[in-house]
């Protein structure tokens, strides 16, 4: 992919968070003439809403300051990675409205990492250790007690080089040896207590096959990957703050910009020599109530079939949110509203829902749909009567145009819009009462038909002929207006009424001996058969509508077709969870 400036799908007002202030100062001082960022996900799962914040920051920052942003897939743990996730990650980034300057993989740099590791050995900064994982834990010490040096720490440079090369040759089994940095076992930062840089894993890699029986550890590969790509500002969440000294140690001790010979393997791949010293900057991660974002827990939800897959519209993966009907514009607006800071906080889920309502209120055409149908027969109209009415597609935006809506003697209305014994303040249909049928006229109910069990199955009534659209009587005041669809023309559809997956604000809270599984909301998905006007059934997959008086819905991207319409409720018209 050619190296073009990262582009944002919107042009937001200038933001003044602390990261942007750092970038402005770096550019103003001449420390950097241009900036480069990267988004470096591991392809071992689907991206979730927390990643949206990082994506918008990494790509948005580059776009805002005329820089570049790479997409780098951190594929250093092949046992857990899958090409399926690689495709999904790229799809998610593009869906959010961003394009990368270059698509890179950590595996592109495996030869560079290896040469860098040999340099550390030659410089006396790394050694091959034979301790087992359990022994390493015992030697590491605790937060209050210093660690102990490995008995293999003082091996000679020649012995370390020999052992490391034999590790690469595949001579030793998994876990037999590691390459460790030689830093300080007494450091107050446990990450600096001679951390592992390489481990032995005889696992086939999706890109390199069986060429490598050893793989770099995250901190080593991540820091050098940034340096290799000339990243100026390496942005990550606060849990990596304690890793920053190790990040800097790796960058400084390897010194790629001062040792261009280490970059020689890249020249054959056509990669430019652009090594630089990156700066790691941490920001608070995105925490939202009523959610879990642990990859382990999300995986369990899928594997235990508590949800219908990674793109279940109740999931907090970007694939799930997209299928639910969340839009890229709403996601970007949400990230802007949340902001960037170093203070951890929990964002109310209603903020996310509010951003979607705001976007769809402006962007979604209106349609009529009935999700719990009750038949209303207008007996003063002739048998078989039908006609075509003109409706505006959007009450606030004439550019959406108009559409034809069929009207007939027999209609479907919402069951909840009729009350035989109305509560106080009721403004909808009652026996003998009048209501305005949206865009069609004023109707009255004269007769209630029930089945043998006493259930209401049909209403019979009258349509005031003087109240039709354009007539003087259409201005006559009545208490309320309801929507409807023609029973003759309406298309039956599956209507999926989604809600929050968890019923409590903190599903991760296990203080009462419960787990997140115990807090699953039994009302998070309800599927009903309803009716939609014909133009709604003709929607393209992922087309969003406001179903009038009902909520915002999207044509399911997997299951919807004109013959078998399927709509997912994206969000209700109002916050039904407000306290």
Swiss-Prot record:
InterPro entries: aa-tRNA-synth_I_CS, Gln/Glu-tRNA_Ligase, Gln_tRNA_ligase_bac, Glu/Gln-tRNA-synth, Glu/Gln-tRNA-synth_Ib_cat-dom, Glu/Gln-tRNA-synth_Ib_codon-bd, Glu_tRNA_lig_a-bdl, Rbsml_bL25/Gln-tRNA_synth_N. L-glutamine binds at residues 74, 218. GO terms for biological process: glutaminyl-tRNA aminoacylation; glutamyl-tRNA aminoacylation. A motif ('HIGH' region) lies at residues 41-51. Its main location: cytoplasm. The keyword S-adenosyl-L-methionine does not apply. ATP binds at residues 42-44, 48-54, 237, 285-286, 293-295. Belongs to the class-I aminoacyl-tRNA synthetase family. This is Glutamine--tRNA ligase. The lineage of its organism: Bacteria, Pseudomonadati, Pseudomonadota, Gammaproteobacteria, Lysobacterales.
